[in-house]
Amino acid sequence: MFMYPEFARKALSKLISKKLNIEKVSSKHQLVLLDYGLHGLLPKSLYLEAINSDILNVRFFPPEIINVTDIVKALQNSCRVDEYLKSVSLYHKNSLMVSGPNVVKLMIEYNLLTHSDLEWLINENVVKATYLLKINAYMINFKIDLTVDEIIDLVKDIPVGATLHLYNILNNIDLDIVLRISDEYNIPPVHDILSKLTDEEMCIKLVTKYPMDNVINFINQDVRYSPTFIKTIKDFVNEHLPTMYDGLNDYLHSVIIDEDLIEEYKIKSVAMFNLEYKTDVNTLTLDEQIFVEVNISYYDFRYRQFADEFRDYIMIKERRQITMQSGDRIRRFRRPMSLRSTIIKKDTDSLEDILAHIDNARKNSKVSIEDVERIISSFRLNPCVVRRTMLSDIDIKTKIMVLKIVKDWKSCALTLSAIKGIMVTDTINTVLSKILHHHRNVFKYLTSVENKEIAVCNCSRCLSLFYRELKSVRCDLHTDDGLLDRLYDLTRYALHGKINQNLIGQRCWGPLTEMLFNENKKKKLNNLMEYIKISDMLVYGHSIEKTLIPITDSLSFKLSVDTMSVLNDQYAKVVIFFNTIIEYIIATIYYRLTVLNNYTNVKHFVSKVLHTVMEACGVLFSYIKVNDKIEHELEEMVDKGTVPSYLYHLSINVISIILDDINGTR
């Protein structure tokens, strides 16, 4: 089948014939082009139609004609701001900044505001400084004044690092506040104000409470050189060896002469104080051996010959190897980062790169249609190729050449692929094309039933079921029947527009979101399933509904690193719907194998899972055959975390049948 339905291909042909000028095609074709994302930048005349089709189309209009409220809606529906949405947002920045605290929060998360913008917001009382600090304290690098109550309220809600940054930007910070925060919230008082503290006993308590945080550097100079203070800190350091506190060691090195340190600590002084000391590994005491091994990374840096000799000594004496640990003790502090960003990581060979290459080749020599078709074939499953091509900077003749190829793309429905030695029909292309063809019909259906109570629902699919109540109200999740009953209820809820995107503690890890939204899941499957034992997989019966969200509230553009890879909101949510059903299938099977440790009759159980899902969707007379080799594949999935390709194939067959049933094309 063609990737695009016939009416979409016809509309695209008309657009090509009009030299890609969308204003010159009929209004009927314009609406089709908007629905399928077959356009580039848009004219003012199509504003209302485009916004009604998808709010993120706002980014494709000239900024001067855009309504600020539409930009706000677009920001709310995004996870990343691409160059187009960023451009229109910055054009209307002043208006957006006074559109309310929630809009300001979005702009901060998308890095659309500068430090001077934030300073203006605070000075003009548009938003409170505390509100901005709770969003991202590091964004504010200018001096501010806060009351004690405001400071304490902030400290409750921001990380330790943000609190330490707060200390540096406050005009009215005082010793009492810093000590109170340390006492009540265990945040180290690392600020110059601490030097005003002259109570030696209190200073000792603070230094020993935060030995890793270099509080010692802020202690009053008179206290630092007090013999009692020096002795107490030295005793504390000795008490905790072989654990080392670099800041305290540096302090001791600054107040005690090298000769005395070497005499007391000997080989330990190399790691503790970076002093030179030579000795024979054969003369080390047991205590020294333990210390050297624990802190071998220091010796790797400061006395490599000794470190090598010590490793050889341990290998010969104890027949074990001390691994290289250099750099383990380097401490790295990272500021918290927002999930949102204006930065999009570019693939090595993106579509835009390839289009530019084709364009350059056309200018220098004749390029055949076959060559172009071959070089862009890897983007066959991407429903946004047309839009990205039209938005690119290449010559219009090159754009038309590419669009003519894309218009006639077909899914490889009859391609045979070998999966784990099994010859199966490759259905993934067909399913993706089906979703592209019918996503609006499926979305319309899901939203029409999402408010119905499934136990009393009288929709056509529920009326055809043998069992319409919740099956898992009284179930034993240690049995196959219990797992299948819960799966039945989960799937029925999904068919009524309510899904759990976080069933196993991970969101959107299935094959459809991975392929369509450029979600690159490097983690092995067994790592993704790490928290399955304490996840929503334990929920059943009436409690299931509490874990669900309406499909209309599901993440859509927020799945993708690059919103340009998502066709539109409805399409994304339909993909999420089918992807979630596949996740239910995989998670149920994985739970039986790993949590219940039940490997009996695996093939039969997989078959039951697949048919339970179809039955819950009102598909009662379809059969999917499961090959014996599924058992070996699932063993590898559990043991090695490998992707269960054949199980994915079976699951995609299931959603293909369900899609056809919803769309009325079975």
UniProtKB/Swiss-Prot annotation:
Keywords, comma-separated and alphabetical: Early protein, Membrane, Transmembrane, Transmembrane helix
Keyword DNA-binding: no
Induction entry: Expressed in the early phase of the viral replicative cycle.
Broad class of where this protein is predominantly found: membrane
Membrane topology annotation: Single-pass membrane protein
Transmembrane region(s): 574-596
GO CC terms in record: membrane
Stated family: Belongs to the orthopoxvirus OPG074 family.
Protein name from the UniProt record: Protein OPG074
Organism placement in taxonomy: Viruses, Varidnaviria, Bamfordvirae, Nucleocytoviricota, Pokkesviricetes
Gene name as annotated: OPG074
